[in-house]
Design a protein with these regions (language model features):
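Generic recognition of stable, solvent-exposed alpha-helical segments in well-folded globular domains
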Residues: 18-25, 29, 138-145, 279, ...
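A generic secondary-structure signal for well-formed alpha-helical elements
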Residues: 34-41, 150-161, 310
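N-terminal pre-domains immediately preceding structured catalytic cores
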Residues: 52-57, 170-179, 321
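A general structural signal for short secondary-structure junctions and capping/turn motifs
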Residues: 68-71, 93-99, 119-121, 169, ...
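Extended, charged alpha-beta segments that form solvent-exposed binding/catalytic grooves
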Residues: 105-191, 195
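Extracellular structured ligand-interaction cores
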Residues: 101-103, 124-128, 204-206, 246-248
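A translation/RNA-centric and nucleic-acid-associated enzymatic feature enriched
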Residues: 108-110, 180-336
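Class II aminoacyl-tRNA synthetase-like tRNA-binding/catalytic domains
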Residues: 2-120, 128-132
Length: 336
């Protein structure tokens, strides 16, 4: 229970029934506007994949996927997805998408090794999106342009919710602030990555933190990223300050995806060059998959933020430690 933050005198403005209405309101408005602005088509997506395909997201490389055997297929193994970061790029080609077009999915995942707290759950739900780009668009300028488009959707959603609900006030700034992980480390020496994120988010309100995954001058990484989907020089997190919990809150992780050269380099840096032999990774090396940009946007985090909830368990149904459930209820936090 050490990870549970209990805001002083917290009381949800919405009961359980009205919370469900609010969740649907946020999700419907946000995803429809996102699809319109980024030219995305909703597609069906897998809950599990073949481990041998290389399509699962390895996250930081140490998290264990949920694995089960399929009786009809002689107990052939299947993995519950961590995310659809790689599958989406494969799907764009398989489904016949063209330049400038993209897809999005309602992704559900289980992350069994997640350390839970107010904003982390073993159940992950997000809008996973991916879009075909040109080689010329593999640039910081295009990344920032796309981030601004996503951020405008966030701001419009907040404005819409503030009109629908009297208790919601707009807190997102007009513009998002761009900074690299190295610039952030230089700005706040002697701090941890999470401390730096909090400091810059509280100062700016909304931050796009770029270039995540490679080593900084300090010899440390700001955060881990799998080497075979994001280009570590062309990725970003959208982070906002969340006053309900007095924390920095990541709402989206996104990036321009690796091309052949970036993936080979990053696999080598990550110490797993053998992954280049997996089907998905080999397809990138052979230039068989389109160049893309994509990301994941946390559905529960979006709902939590716009409904001003104190715990992600107020907007999604998951399993929590018994002492957390008890302490939350005693302090006005009703977990679903």
């Amino acid at each position: 229970m050490n990870n549970l933050i209990i805001p002083k005198d917290y009381q949800s403005a919405l009961n359980l029934h009205d919370t469900q209405v609010g969740i649907k309101t946020v999700k419907d408005f946000f995803q429809n506007l996102l699809a319109e602005r980024l030219h995305l088509l909703r597609v069906s997506a897998p809950l599990f994949v073949d481990p041998a395909s290389g399509l699962n997201d390895n996250l930081n490389g140490v998290e264990r996927p949920v694995v089960f055997g399929i009786k009809e297929q002689n107990e052939a193994q299947a993995e519950i997805v961590h995310s659809l970061a790689k599958w989406k790029r494969y799907a764009l080609q398989k489904y016949g998408f063209s330049y400038g077009e993209g897809l999005y999915t309602d992704m559900s995942a289980i992350r069994r090794d997640e350390l839970t707290d107010n904003i982390h759950s073993i159940y992950v739900d997000q809008w996973d999106w991916e879009k075909i780009i040109s080689r010329e668009e593999r640039s910081i300028d295009f990344l920032q342009e796309t981030v601004r488009s996503v951020y405008k959707v966030l701001r419009k959603t907040e404005k819409y919710m503030a009109i629908r609900y009297d208790y919601i006030e707009e807190i997102l700034p007009h513009d998002i602030f761009f900074i690299t992980t190295q610039e952030l480390e230089d700005m706040y020496p002697g701090t941890t990555p999470k401390e730096r994120e909090y400091l810059i988010a509280k100062e700016k309100g909304a931050v796009c933190l770029m270039q995540i995954g490679d080593l900084l001058k300090s010899g440390e990484k700001h955060d881990g990223r799998a080497p075979d989907y994001d280009d570590w020089a062309l990725n970003a997190d959208i982070i906002v300050y969340y006053p309900v919990l007095d924390i920095s809150l990541e709402l989206s992780s996104m990036g321009i995806r690796v091309d052949k050269d970036a993936m080979i380099s990053q696999l080598d840096k990550a110490g797993c060059p053998e992954r280049a032999e997996l089907p998905f990774q080999k397809a990138i090396i052979n230039d068989e998959l389109p160049l893309t940009i994509g990301g994941g946007i946390g559905q529960s985090r979006i709902c939590m933020f716009f409904l001003r909830k104190a715990h992600i368990g107020e907007v999604q149904s998951s399993l929590w430690p018994e002492d957390v459930t008890k302490a939350a209820l005693e302090n006005g936090i009703q977990l679903l």
